């Protein structure tokens, strides 16, 4: 027998054995991944039978698994490439405003380090990344100045790199931060002029990035923005009045309503612009992201059940009802009367089809106690501005089972807004900065519990199409500074080194287990990969 024939036979056998070995290795990996599921950390909250039932759930093929961030909390580079001061740049420079006296001038330096951070996302297996744009980086002086092409070029590069990684950008126009110029010039959200500025800004973003961005949200948590900025004064522009806070100026009863109204009108203007000039060609979607709290009646009494409804009206539906139905919630209209701004006929015209989706940021739940027909303790909330509701995390010293709030909130939005598309745009767990904690079991337990609740809502019919973990990295956490850590990756803020926590491995395994691609298909894919062993 010729040597060439012998070598050919040996090569064929080797190839066959190698192919079989790949299949066996794939089986072993799949088994190990299944054994390393989240059930070992959360078997105290549901039975083993229920866990197995949950594990059979597979998300739709186009479901978005991702992580979320915001410009001010991540980017740093606060005066780089033509950017000027934002409201948060100015606010964090005021003594006593931030818990540890810190700021976001560097943050996690995502502006320069995002390519490496995209590698981390790719390793996790996510297929989407929720980020926000810095308004002050694109329009340093609002509509009163030129477009900063340094900012445009940066975001163009970043969006292109995100897409090259196989990840879908999910972009928010503003996540609390605005050019400080607009605050100096006319008082930002307290002035109707802000609508023109926001529409101008949205137009530039749609024009420069919309050919590649298929998911837009106008605002992130405008309810938090106006409550903390204009009622308690703990966020910029730090306006309030007693008894809500001790600010140098402001009106905690009226100004939140005015700011909210101008935000709603700005949202409607941006959506109308996108619908009429961009959506048909760009084929994207546009929505809004809200902070949500599930309010559970503290008792079965009618008064407390109605209080829970009022709590939602004065927190969530305050913004969503005008956008969807063209009017403020009935509970707000009954209590606030003429203090509540009115919508004109022209406003209502643009409110039709004003949402393709609602983004749900869900972290917590509260008990709601009636203060309209009952006496509440002084200093415990429950004012007219809050709908005469006292919201508390505890009942008889015990905390509400918070993961239930995810399921309840998703079903509430589904029923109230007629099966609208939903994305869980933020969900995560913060821990005090007590050193390098890499075995973050509490975060794993939190995420797995909430994701189980999300699955249950989907089984009941909620049209949930994505989940974004907050967050990939530890970052600047607003007035808490760097005292709280939310990252699946620990960040050493002195060196910017990223180190994976247990939650990063857990989330990676969760995505692998639950995406629509079956494990058999995944194994076949690996069998065909000629570089499978070169790792």
From Swiss-Prot:
ATP-binding listed as a keyword: no
EC number(s) per entry: 3.2.1.21
PANTHER family to which the protein is assigned, alphabetical: BETA-GLUCOSIDASE 47, GLYCOSYL HYDROLASE
Disulfide bonds: 240-247, 371-376
Signal sequence residues: 1-38
Active site residues of this protein: 221 (proton donor), 426 (nucleophile)
GO biological process: carbohydrate metabolic process
Organism per entry: Arabidopsis thaliana
Binding of a beta-D-glucoside, residues: 73, 175, 220-221, 363, 426, 470, 477-478, 486
Glycan attachment sites: 93, 246, 419, 432
Catalysed conversion reaction: Hydrolysis of terminal, non-reducing beta-D-glucosyl residues with release of beta-D-glucose
One Pfam family recorded for the sequence: Glyco_hydro_1
Gene3D superfamilies named among the record's database cross-references: Glycosidases (3.20.20.80)
Disulfide bond listed as a keyword: yes
Keyword field: Disulfide bond, Glycoprotein, Glycosidase, Hydrolase, Signal
Family per record: Belongs to the glycosyl hydrolase 1 family.
InterPro entries listed in its UniProt record: Glyco_hydro_1, Glyco_hydro_1_AS, Glyco_hydro_1_N_CS, Glycoside_hydrolase_SF
Name of the protein this chain belongs to: Beta-glucosidase 47
A Gene Ontology molecular function term of the record: beta-glucosidase activity
